[in-house]
Amino acid sequence: MEPGTNSFQVEFPDFSSTILQKLNQQRQQGQLCDVSIVVQGHIFQAHKAVLAASSPYFCDQVLLKNSRRIVLPDVMNPRVFENILLFSYTGRLVMPAPEIVSYLTAASFLQMWHVVDKCTEVLEGNPTVLCQKLNHGSDHQSPSSSNYNGLVESFELGSGGHTDFPKAQELRDGENEEESTKDELSSQVTEHEYLPSNSSTEHDRLSTEMASQDGEEGTNDSTEFHYTRPLYSKPSIMAHRRWIHVKPERLEQAWDGMDVHAAYDEHQVTESVNTMQTDHSAQPSGAEEEFQIVEKKVEVEFDEQAEGSSYDEQVDFYGSSMEEFSGEKLGGNLIGHKQEAALAAGYSENIEMAMGIKEEASHLGFSATDKLYPCQCGKSFTHKSQRDRHMSMHLGLRPYGCSVCGKKFKMKHHLVGHMKIHTGIKPYECNICAKRFMWRDSFHRHVTSCTKSYEAAKAEQNTTEAN
């Protein structure tokens, strides 16, 4: 008789979920917990086995270090971590739309890649969520940031005015408090979903408040013009033009004419339109006229650049594209970038003069080199655009793909260097021995050694001829 012939196999499909549910109840009641996680002073009790099974980060902490107390960085939001901890026990994760990037960052730190994949899918399917997150600041910006208290306050106040996050110890009184916490989170998500058509007035009020807190537009502009920054450009190795916000009436000016006189006439038309739209619009000052002239110059310059290079052009991997990273080209590009930065600085100064905006950082005594735009990973940036590019690294976007092998890259120059492998082009040639090289660093090393050998041989030949 074969072993196991008379055995019976019985399965309980919901047994694992029931065990996790009971473990979660024990966690909330503070029973049999063997590890404490500290997030910004908030202490969360949990079980090592559950944490190690759900997160490789916690697995390393409890197995390799045998830690009973784990302190997470202050950049992590306690509310976000509590929901992720609850997810480890229940398998359900409720993510408010404005905080998806916060969940993505926290899951990346905890190495919970299944959560990272889900957050990435949500962001790819709803790009407006990331635009709102990047435009209105992260949840952990310092008070020195111009976007501080923007989205966080509106989110917390919208949930009923509960601005203080409850301590973890206060959530251990039983299953009833767990249900109340779920109801509170559900109400927060419900209030920040897309509003129905019959509540358009409330939606407009929230949009106006969020736009006014951004600090980049005046009072009238924040209520009349709403724009979003392009999130993702089509994969291409062509140099795309920079994104510049041009208001509707000024875009019409760029189409009608490019000379200063036409700009002045259309400015008068714009003035009359603004007067009809609102009774509180101010009369244009000399600074505003100067601002429009500078803006016109910027538009003309970008139009000229667009005429010089089209998106439909094919990249020459055999010639100029390889030389654009040489020392001469690099120096020219740096000078050009400095000139563009100076022009952009003058552009911003005219905006502030026309709209009467004063930077809050000047009152706090910050200099121009202060990094006012922090990321949740701990890094800070001087300009908002730099933080936006940094966020794309967290998302793992690789917009530049190789048409031959399909490999994708985060930077354009990485793709250009990769194409040398497929084309076999060796653009660097030694003037002494005519040997060619594919990579510039190898070429420079060879030139150094080859020059020394050539000079030594030439000196020896001169000595022989002299004798």
Curated annotation (Swiss-Prot):
Gene Ontology terms, MF aspect: RNA polymerase III general transcription initiation factor binding; sequence-specific double-stranded DNA binding; zinc ion binding
Residue(s) carrying N-acetylmethionine: M1
BTB domain segment(s): 33-97
Annotated localization: Nucleus
CDD domains found in the cross-reference section: BTB_POZ_ZBTB43
Composition-biased stretches (Polar residues): 140-149
Task of the protein: May be involved in transcriptional regulation.
UniProt-recorded name of the protein: Zinc finger and BTB domain-containing protein 43
Protein species of origin: Mus musculus
Gene name as annotated: Zbtb43
